């Protein structure tokens, strides 16, 4: 008789309850409370507008709202921790008081993450994979919150792209573990669009199963990014279909969470993908 493998529960535990990614792909809706993000800068930088947009995304199928107060687009101006907090904290407090939705704080500054979690955020999303701020992993450990460790590096000096990326990500895992973050509180992100050329981004998309095979939940953040614009020759606001294609490939290759702007359309795509892949173990009626 074949030995049975014990199936992982596939749960992300947060202080707002557990998120299961076993039956469905989780949707993270992007909320930039910044004046200069590449795709929606300035649209949601008042607390009231931020709340309305978060509510709309939650209604359209977002399980997590990812709030960022500093644009990460190439060439964006740097923002002080105080300025970043003045943007994100009021939005987090307002959304937490009005909506029953998980909030992730998109920051690489430990002080911002700390205040954001105190204000109601339940996940930390760090584009520097706990390598940008030496205190970030400790903040995640102190609050016992999940942390998304994204692949990034200062230079594109790869010897061999995929193995180098895997080594970089495992370095982030090691930093987090040494600070006291538990394995089940780590989520990985291959960092599409960060320290990668156009060709690199396409190559990573083609090898996503290698990253989902590491045993951690995998987040894919491709929404409206430049490599999609280059393939389709379209501006950011016209990249929903291209984003959808990347999401469908990602789901097929084992991604568990997708971070997107166009929640309504993408949620329909992931629901269809999940049904075809029989993700919940029983076909959806």
Residue spans for each PLM region:
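N-terminal carbohydrate-binding accessory modules
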Residues: 2-23
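N-terminal binding-site loop/beta-alpha segment at the start of enzyme catalytic domains
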Residues: 20, 26-48
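Catalytic domains of carbohydrate-active enzymes, especially glycoside hydrolases
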Residues: 52-68
């Amino acid at each position: 008789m074949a030995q049975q493998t014990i199936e992982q529960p596939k749960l992300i535990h947060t202080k707002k309850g557990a998120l299961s990614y076993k039956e469905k792909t989780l949707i993270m809706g992007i909320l930039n409370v910044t004046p200069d993000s590449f795709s929606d800068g300035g649209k949601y930088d008042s607390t009231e507008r931020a709340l309305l947009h978060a509510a709309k995304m939650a209604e359209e199928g977002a399980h997590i709202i990812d709030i960022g107060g500093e644009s990460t687009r190439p060439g964006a101006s740097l923002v002080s921790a105080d300025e970043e907090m003045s943007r994100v904290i009021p939005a987090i407090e307002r959304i937490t008081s009005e909506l029953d939705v998980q909030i992730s704080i998109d920051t690489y500054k430990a002080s911002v993450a700390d205040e954001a979690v105190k204000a109601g955020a339940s996940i930390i999303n760090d584009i520097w994979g706990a390598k940008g701020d030496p205190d970030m992993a400790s903040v995640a450990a102190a609050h016992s919150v999940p942390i998304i460790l994204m692949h990034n590096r200062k230079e594109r000096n790869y010897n061999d792209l995929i193995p180098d990326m895997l080594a970089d990500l495992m370095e982030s895992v090691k930093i987090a573990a040494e600070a006291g973050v538990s394995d089940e509180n780590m989520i990985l992100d291959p960092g599409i669009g960060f320290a990668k050329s156009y060709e690199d981004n396409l190559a990573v998309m083609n090898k996503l199963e290698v990253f989902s095979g590491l045993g951690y939940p995998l987040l894919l953040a491709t929404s409206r990014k430049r490599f999609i614009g280059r393939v389709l020759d379209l501006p950011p606001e016209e990249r929903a279909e291209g984003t959808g294609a990347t999401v469908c490939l990602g789901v097929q290759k084992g991604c568990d969470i997708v971070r997107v702007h166009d929640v309504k359309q993408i949620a329909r795509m992931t629901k269809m993908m999940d049904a075809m892949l029989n993700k919940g173990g029983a076909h959806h009626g």
